[in-house]
């Protein structure tokens, strides 16, 4: 009998660490399904989920404080292996009879762990491990039946284990790339200790998603709002593989897209992949609604409302469509559930994840709702979507609506499109595009004096923006070569009539945000 990709699973309890989603992504990368739930989950929910192993994440709280988070007692009564990471190790130690104390020496950054004894967690690893620490408190006394399996110069219990019960704790973060052997440690736990198999692969995810879509919609028709972005594009390919021409995609051209993007979407999905796709040219409608609006939040809301109205009108023309496909991904689900209930594991379908009307009388098809963004990209490649589309830099939902500062006009959008295309083209030509995390151009609603030939010109200013980041929570401005910036500036000023000055944004995040609006 073929095993289902969800048959073996790891449960990750979230205590609030900034790295918790990274733990889940690493487990998926190993090839095992996992879910991320809030630490205060009910015992009945854990029983129903029936995990093969449980990971307790790090977190910002202190075990020494009253009312700080604790793992549900059932975690330790369930008989399944448990791995505590950072705060997770501390609460494990304290709950099982050990002691945790505050430390005058906060350990943050690289450290060397000396591995002692033999532990399944460190199988096939060197006895000295470079790891990433981020903690103030530390375990000062381990519970009975545990042994020390790792220490640093300042942390006597950097790792502990109860091999019989398959309980493990590490004070460092194996999920971050700074911990060189971290992925191997997680593999040792997930595959070795928990006994899971690598069932979670791009091929098996696609096979499972297609089967579930077929079962869910049967012979009904499905409608999808296709933006040309990663998520909706992968949904389009999955649903089309499942039901073929019973899928209709609606592509709304709002006039706020990148240069030639509308035609590229139609060429790729209509001509190349043979999907049913309706293009709605709504540029005038969007620009009319945006007249006189300069506040960024007001612009975002206006763009969202007009999109909903346009999509709603088109969906009503498709009388036989009973299902709405959406590109909801797992981080959306986690964030949405946590904000509504405080418990991130409560996974319910609701239109507002995608920002569509509450009164749409359609069922939801969300084939990506279990997937992280990196997984979506991988299955997109498997489905035949081009690499350069799947791995393009992020583009905001409101498009150029938040890259034209202040009021939006067609003239401004047209100038910005052409300037941005030159910047991106030159980044590719110089082999710099994939060396920065995000790059784009911003239109500034100010005029500046310039000289062209023998005459003076009084035209608009654009700013180039390029950043390097791992998680987009913080970012450094990219130190692009001066010669490169000079070339881009010259091309924009010479080739885009209406722009007289180009500047480069050297602000980090914080204090600035990556986007200007």
Swiss-Prot record:
Assembly description: Homodimer.
Reactions this protein catalyses: XMP + L-glutamine + ATP + H2O = GMP + L-glutamate + AMP + diphosphate + 2 H(+)
Superkingdom per UniProt: Bacteria
Keyword Lipid biosynthesis appears in the UniProt entry: no
Range of residues in the leader sequence: none
Name under which the protein is recorded: GMP synthase [glutamine-hydrolyzing]
Cited function: Catalyzes the synthesis of GMP from XMP.
HAMAP family hit by this protein: GMP_synthase
Entry keyword annotation includes ATP-binding: yes
UniProt-listed Pfam families: GATase, GMP_synt_C, NAD_synthase
UniProtKB keywords: ATP-binding, Glutamine amidotransferase, GMP biosynthesis, Ligase, Nucleotide-binding, Purine biosynthesis
Active site: residue positions: 86 (nucleophile), 173, 175
Gene that this polypeptide is encoded by: guaA
Limits of the GMPS ATP-PPase domain: 200-392
GO CC list: cytosol
Pathway participation: Purine metabolism; GMP biosynthesis; GMP from XMP (L-Gln route): step 1/1
Domain Glutamine amidotransferase type-1: 9-199
Binding site for ATP: 227-233
